[in-house]
Amino acid sequence: MELSCSEAPLYGQMMIYAKFDKNVYLPEDAEFYFTYDGSHQRHVMIAERIEDNVLQSSVPGHGLQETVTVSVCLCSEGYSPVTMGSGSVTYVDNMACRLARLLVTQANRLTACSHQTLLTPFALTAGALPALDEELVLALTHLELPLEWTVLGSSSLEVSSHRESLLHLAMRWGLAKLSQFFLCLPGGVQALALPNEEGATPLDLALREGHSKLVEDVTNFQGRWSPSFSRVQLSEEASLHYIHSSETLTLTLNHTAEHLLEADIKLFRKYFWDRAFLVKAFEPEARPEERTAMPSSGAETEEEIKNSVSSRSAAEKEDIKRVKSLVVQHNEHEDQHSLDLDRSFDILKKSKPPSTLLAAGRLSDMLNGGDEVYANCMVIDQVGDLDISYINIEGITATTSPESRGCTLWPQSSKHTLPTETSPSVYPLSENVEGTAHTEAQQSFMSPSSSCASNLNLSFGWHGFEKEQSHLKKRSSSLDALDADSEGEGHSEPSHICYTPGSQSSSRTGIPSGDELDSFETNTEPDFNISRAESLPLSSNLQSKESLLSGVRSRSYSCSSPKISLGKTRLVRELTVCSSSEEQRAYSLSEPPRENRIQEEEWDKYIIPAKSESEKYKVSRTFSFLMNRMTSPRNKSKTKSKDAKDKEKLNRHQFAPGTFSGVLQCLVCDKTLLGKESLQCSNCNANVHKGCKDAAPACTKKFQEKYNKNKPQTILGNSSFRDIPQPGLSLHPSSSVPVGLPTGRRETVGQVHPLSRSVPGTTLESFRRSATSLESESDHNSCRSRSHSDELLQSMGSSPSTESFIMEDVVDSSLWSDLSSDAQEFEAESWSLVVDPSFCNRQEKDVIKRQDVIFELMQTEMHHIQTLFIMSEIFRKGMKEELQLDHSTVDKIFPCLDELLEIHRHFFYSMKERRQESCAGSDRNFVIDRIGDILVQQFSEENASKMKKIYGEFCCHHKEAVNLFKELQQNKKFQNFIKLRNSNLLARRRGIPECILLVTQRITKYPVLVERILQYTKERTEEHKDLRKALCLIKDMIATVDLKVNEYEKNQKWLEILNKIENKTYTKLKNGHVFRKQALMSEERTLLYDGLVYWKTATGRFKDILALLLTDVLLFLQEKDQKYIFAAVDQKPSVISLQKLIAREVANEERGMFLISASSAGPEMYEIHTNSKEERNNWMRRIQQAVESCPEEKGGRTSESDEDKRKAEARVAKIQQCQEILTNQDQQICAYLEEKLHIYAELGELSGFEDVHLEPHLLIKPDPGEPPQAASLLAAALKEAESLQVAVKASQMGAVSQSCEDSCGDSVLADTLSSHDVPGSPTASLVTGGREGRGCSDVDPGIQGVVTDLAVSDAGEKVECRNFPGSSQSEIIQAIQNLTRLLYSLQAALTIQDSHIEIHRLVLQQQEGLSLGHSILRGGPLQDQKSRDADRQHEELANVHQLQHQLQQEQRRWLRRCEQQQRAQATRESWLQERERECQSQEELLLRSRGELDLQLQEYQHSLERLREGQRLVEREQARMRAQQSLLGHWKHGRQRSLPAVLLPGGPEVMELNRSESLCHENSFFINEALVQMSFNTFNKLNPSVIHQDATYPTTQSHSDLVRTSEHQVDLKVDPSQPSNVSHKLWTAAGSGHQILPFHESSKDSCKNDLDTSHTESPTPHDSNSHRPQLQAFITEAKLNLPTRTMTRQDGETGDGAKENIVYL
C-alpha cells in the first residue's frame, strides 16, 4: 500500500489516497476505514473507493507533532475488521499553525503596528497572507481556545474605548474568511464597532487598505456563517468531529492502548449510520428550524414546519430543551457502553409482573386483525392517556407516537420522504401538551437502535420507497449487531417491527391504538443494561426509578401458552417480518422469566380469542397442565415401580453424571439439582435427579434427527440474510419446552442463532436461494406460508433439536448442524457396522479391511475438523467477543486456525463426495474403490505447500501457545471462561492444550492409515501407485514440517543464548581484531549445533564450556552470574573461524579431539573433550560438514591486492617513521628553548635581580596526539609587549639616568620580536579575530590558566607603574622575561604545528598518488574491486558517522538522565534536610521532656525518702508505745490491789488514795457503777467513733460484771466544764486499752502525741481486749472476798434524789 502524502499539518483537512497493488482485491460491498494511531490518540474515518485499487479519505486533525501509523481496514458483513495495509504520516507544525497560536496568545497585546510586527518572525508579507486565509481558519478551529478568551482578548480585561483587536488585524490583512470567523467568535460583534488607538474601526481599516470587497462581505454578513468544525464529546475518552466543508466525520479516542481497533471501528460505524443523531448533533446553530424537527412526511413543506415550530408555547420549547439534554446524556452513556462491552447483563431478570389492564385493550384490538397474535405487555394505567414521558436510556427509545416509525436516517429530510398516504402528521393532536412536546421532540431524537431497526432491516409495505431503502440496507447490514451487545453472551439482536399503512389509522386521535402501544414497547426491546441503572439520565418530568424500570421492561406472551417455563431471560433474537397484506400485523415476542408469569385466570379474563384459536390454546394448556401433574413428585412415586421398564424403553436417554456451572432445576420435579445427585442426557441435554430419571419424558433425539433431515437450512440471524425480505412468519417457543435446561441454554430454544464470521460462501449462497424461494412462496400464497410457519413452530417447540439444547451463542448453528450430521453418519466404529450385514458378507476379507481403514480415515478426519471447530467457535470466538482479548494474543494461541479448517474441510468433503459416488444402489451400502487420487491431490503441489507452511507454523508455535495459555490462566476471569467452555458438551471435555496437541499429532496419523490401506490394496494397480505416491508425499511433508520445527527451535535457542551473552564481553582474535557480541547478531549466522564440552587447559584441567557451532565460526562460551561470556582459557581466542579448521582424534582419548585452526594470522590448537565417544564423533562429523559448507570470506584478495596491501603498509610505516623523527626534533627544539629560558633566569640572578620571578619552563608540552593552540600565546605576548612599553615609558619619565637602560630595553624588545619572527599584521589580525569571535575556546586549559596569571600580574605591574613613575628595573626585567617565555612557547607551538601539517600533507599526497596510479595502471576487474572497496569504505565511514551520531544522542540522553538524577538527588537532599530538622526538633523536645522527668524522679525519690523516714519514726513510736503498754500492764498487776478508789457522794469525783492513806484507812475500795456508766455515756456522746475504734467495753458488759445494790440506775449529771481527774485515774489504773480522756481538754497524751481520731490510729481490738479478763477477775475477787454494804445519799446540789451503790472494801 502506498500513501499519497507523508506529511500533514496539525489541523489535517487534506485529502489522502491509498493505492494498493493490482493483485489486491477490494470487495465492492465492503466498507473501508482509515485509522490514524498516534502515541495518545486514535482517529477513525471512513474511506471512499475512487478506483479499483485506490481509496480516498481525509486526514483528521491531531494534537501532537509526531508520526502516526495510518492503517486501512476492511469491514465486511459478519467478519471482523481486517487490516489491508499500513503506512505513516508525520504531523508537522506549519506556518499557519504557528501564526494561529501567535494570534491567540497576542490578542491582549495588539497595537496599531501589530499587523507588521507579527509577520516579521515568519518572513511573511501582507501580499502572501491571502493564500493562508483558509489554513488560518482551519488552524484556529483546531486550537482549543481558553474558556475566557474572546476576539478582544481575555474577558477579564476591561474593554477600553480604543484598542486594537484581532478583527482589526484581519481586516488590515484583507482576509475575508478569517474576518468572518472572528465575527462569529465571542466578542466579534463588539470588535466590529470598536475603534482602535487611531480611532479607526475594522471597516475603516479595510477601506484604507483597499479591501472594498471585504467591506461589502462583512456589511452583508449577518452571522449566518457556519463554523467548519463541530465536535461532540461522547465520553472522557471519545469524541466525534465533523467538518462541514468536506462533510467528513472523525471519531477520536484518547489512550489508544486501552481500546481494541475492532471496538473503535464498531463505535464509529454506530454513529456514522445514525444519521438522525448526526443531523441533530452537528447541524449549525443558524438553522434552528431544521434542527428542531425531522418531518417524515413528504406532504409537509418547510414553511409549515417553521410555522408549527414558531407556534409552540414556551412550555413546549422548554420540554424540547429537556429532551435534547436527555439525549446528550444518553449518547454519553451509550458511548461509554460501547467502549466498555464487558459489563452488561439483562435487566429484564428483575422486572415485575405487569398489569393486565393493558392486555384487554390491546388484545381486543389485535385479535381483530390477524390470525396469529403475539402481545407485548407493559404497565399503563389508562389506555387513553398519552402522558408518557420520553425515555432514552442506553439505546432504548420509548414513545407513544407513531411518528417514530417514519423517522429517517438522512441529514436532509427533503431528499428522502415517504409517501403521503403512509406518513402520519408530524404533530399529532393531543389534549396533553406535555405529552405532545415529548412526542415532537422525540420525533427528532430517535435512538439509533429504534430508527435503524425500523428503517434498515425490514421489508416495508411501501413500494415507492424500496429503491432508496435497498441502498441503505446494503451499507448498514450489520447495524443490528452494533446496537445489540457485541459480546455475544447474554444479548441478542433487537426486535424488528413491521408497519403497514393500516396500522396508522389511529395516529391522529388522542387514544393510541395497539400499534402505537406496540411501537412504544418494542422500542424498549433492544439492549438494556442494568449496569447503567444507577446513572440513568432522568429529567424532572420522569417518574420514579421504580415506575421507570417497570415501564421500560417489556415482556411478551404467546396466547397459545401463557405459562411458559423458561429460565433466565435474555433479549430475544427474533425476526418479525411483514406480510403483503395490510391487515396482517406481527408483534415481537420476548421470553418472560419464569417467576414473573401471569396466572392463567387473570390472563383469560381479558382474552376473547376466536373459537378455533381458543380451542387449540385450551387443549394446549390442558395438556401442559396434565404433563406437569403427571410428572409431579406425588404421582411419580406411585407409578415408578410399575412403569420402570416401559419408561426405559421409551426414554432411550443416555444419562451420565453432569457438571453444571449454575443453579439448574430437575426436568421432572422442578427442584434444584445438586452436583452428586444430578444426571445429564448426552443426547438431549436433559437434567434430572438420579431418582427422577425413570419419570423423565421421552428423549427428543430421534425426533430431532428426523426433523434435521427434512428441515431447510435457513439461518435467519445472519446479517446478509436480513437484507432479504422474509415471509410473514414469527418464531416463538412452545409451552412444552423442557424445564430442566441450563440457564445459559434455555433461551436458545425456539430462537435462531446468528451466523459466525467464518461461514463459507457456499453456505451463504444456499441460504440466499432458500430465502428467495420462501419469498416467492409468500408472494403467491400467504396462507401457505403461514401454515408452513405453524409446522415449523410446532416442530421446534415440541421436539427441539439436540443442538438447540447444548449449543450456546458462541457456536455457529449451520456449521455445527453439518458437523453433527456428519458425526451421525460416522458414529459407527467401522465400515462393516455401517453397511447391511448381507452386503458386507458378500465382500472379500481384504476389501472389508480396506474399507474399514478408509472409513477410519474419514472418521478421524471428521473428528479432527470437530476439534478445529471447537477451537475456533467455542474458545477463540469467546476470547475475542466475551473476554475482549487482543486479536494478536488470540492468534498466538490459535495460529493458522482458519487455514487449517479450510484445508481439512476441503479434504473431508472430497472424501465424502467420493463416498456418495461409491454407493451401490443404496445410501447405506458403499464401497470406495479409489482413494489414492484424493490423497495425492491433497498432499501434492499447492495443497502440499500450504500444509507444510501451515503445519510448520502451527507446530513451531506449539510451546508458545501452551505457555501463553498457562499465563492467561492466572487471570480469574479467564479461568472462569475456560471452566464454562470446558463444561460445554460440544467441547467433549477437551481443553485448549489437548486440542492443540491433537492438531499437531494429526499429520503423524496419515502415514499409518495410508500404509494400512496400501497393505490391503492390490499391487500393480493405479490405486496402489497413487497410494505409494501419497505415502511418499505425506512422509516428505512430515519431514519438512519437522525440519521447520527444528530450525525454529534452533533459532529460538540461538536468540535465548544471544540474550544471555553479556553485552560488554569480547575476545581478541589472532589477527588483533576484537570480536564482540554485536558481531554475532548477523542474519547470516545461524546455529547449527550446540552442546556442553570440556576445554583442556595447559595445566591439564578441564573447563566447562558451552560450544556453539555456527555457519562460519565455532564459539566457546562460559557461564558467569547467569550470563555468558567469551571463554578465556590459556589466552587463546574463543572464536575459531571454520576456514581451514581441522578436527582430529586424540590418540589415547576416545572422548577427546583436537581442533586445529590453520589461519593466516597464526595456527592454534585446542583440545576438547566430550562426555562420550558417540558425542565426540557427532561433534567431529558436524564440524566437518560445517567446514565444507562454510561460505568463503567476503572480498577475497588477489595476489596483486596483497602486493598493494604490502606497499600501502610500507608507505604507512614510512610515514610513521617520519612522524616519529619530526616529533623527536620538536621535542629537542622545546628542550633547547627551555634551556635558553633557564640560562636567562641564571643571568637574571647573577645581575642582582633577586626579586624578579623567573620561570625556566615553556607554557606548552610537546604532545604527539594533538598540536597545541598558538592563538592564546600570541595574544598574551602582545599584551605583555604593551605592558613592557608602558613600563619603559614610565621609567624614562622617572629618571634620566635610566635612559640608557630604557633604550637597551627597547632594543631588547625589538631584537626579541625580530629574532623570533613574530608575524606581523596577519598574525595580529588572526589573534584579533580569534579574540573577537571565539575567545579562548580552542586553547588548552593549562595554557590559558598560565596566560591569565601573567595577564593579572602584568595588570598589577601596569597600575603600579602608572602610580609610581619611578619604576625600578626589576619590573622591566620581569616583563621582558615573561615576554621571552611567551615567545619561546609560541615558537615551540608553531614548530609542532608545522610538523603535523607536513605529516598530513604527505599522507594526502600518498593517497592521491595511489589513487592516480590505480586509475592509470589498472583497470577492468581490479578497478571494479577497488571501486567496491571504496564503496565499502564509504559505507563504513557512513556507519562511523551514524555511530557517532548515536553516541552523541546517547550522551545527550545520559546528560538528561544525570540532570534528572541530580534534580531527584537535590529533592531528596532537601527532604532529608527537612527530615533532619524535624528529627532535631523532636530530639530537643525529647531532651526537655527527659529533663522534666528527671526532675520529677528526683522529687519522687525525696518524697519517698521522707515517707520512709516517717514510717521509721512511726515504727519506733509504736515500739515505744508497746513497751509503755507492757510496763503499765505489769504495773497494774503489781499495784492494782493496793490502790482503792473512793467515790465521794458530793460529786462525780473519784479520789485516789496514796499507798499510806490506803493502809491507814479501812482498806476499802469503792467503785461507783453509775460513774462508770456516766463516763461511757459521756464519751459516746462526745466522740462515739473512738469507742468503736478503741473497742471499749459496752455498758451492758460493765453492768453484768459489777455487783449492783439496786436494780435501777441513777443518772448522774456531770458538769463537762470541770475536769474529771477521777475518770482519768480510774481508767489509767484499768489499763491503757480502756482509757477515755476528757474531750474538753487537749487531745494529747503525756508524750504530746496527737490522739485525735482523724490523725492517730487507735489501738487494735486485740490490745484493748487483752486486759479485759484481768479487770473482770479483779472485780469478781473483790465481790467474793469483801463484805458489801449499801449507802444512800441525797444530792444537795441538784435536789434530785439519787441512789448510789457503793462497794466498801
Swiss-Prot record:
Region (Interaction with microtubules): 1425-1705
Region (Interaction with PTK2/FAK1): 1295-1304
UniProt cross-references to CDD domains, sorted A to Z: C1_p190RhoGEF, PH_p190RhoGEF, RhoGEF
Listed GO biological process terms: cell morphogenesis; central nervous system neuron axonogenesis; ephrin receptor signaling pathway; neurofilament cytoskeleton organization; regulation of Rho protein signal transduction; regulation of small GTPase mediated signal transduction
UniProt main location, coarse: cytoplasm
Composition bias, Polar residues: 501-510, 710-721, 759-775, 1656-1669
Residue ranges constituting the DH domain according to the UniProt record: 849-1044
Coiled-coil region: 1488-1525
SMART domains, per database record: C1, PH, RhoGEF
Mediates cytoplasmic retention and interaction with YWHAH: annotated span: 1372-1383
Single annotated GO MF: RNA binding
Residue ranges of the region described as RNA-binding: 1496-1527
Subcellular location: Cytoplasm; Cell membrane
Modification Phosphoserine, positions: S313, S478, S624, S1538
Alphabetized UniProt keyword annotations: Cell membrane, Coiled coil, Cytoplasm, Differentiation, Guanine-nucleotide releasing factor, Membrane, Metal-binding, Phosphoprotein, RNA-binding, Zinc, Zinc-finger
UniProt PTM: Phosphorylated on tyrosine upon stimulation of cells by laminin.
Composition bias type Basic and acidic residues, residue spans: 640-649, 777-791, 1191-1207, 1641-1655, 1688-1699
Domain PH: 1086-1188
Region (Mediates cytoplasmic retention and interaction with MAPK8IP1): 1566-1579
Assembly and binders: Homooligomer; forms cytoplasmic aggregates. Forms a complex with MAPK8 and MAPK8IP1. Interacts with RHOA. Interacts with microtubules. Interacts with YWHAE and YWHAH. Interacts with PTK2/FAK1. Interacts with NEFL. Interacts with CTNND2; prevents interaction with RHOA.
The protein, known as: Rho guanine nucleotide exchange factor 28
Organism per entry: Homo sapiens (Human)
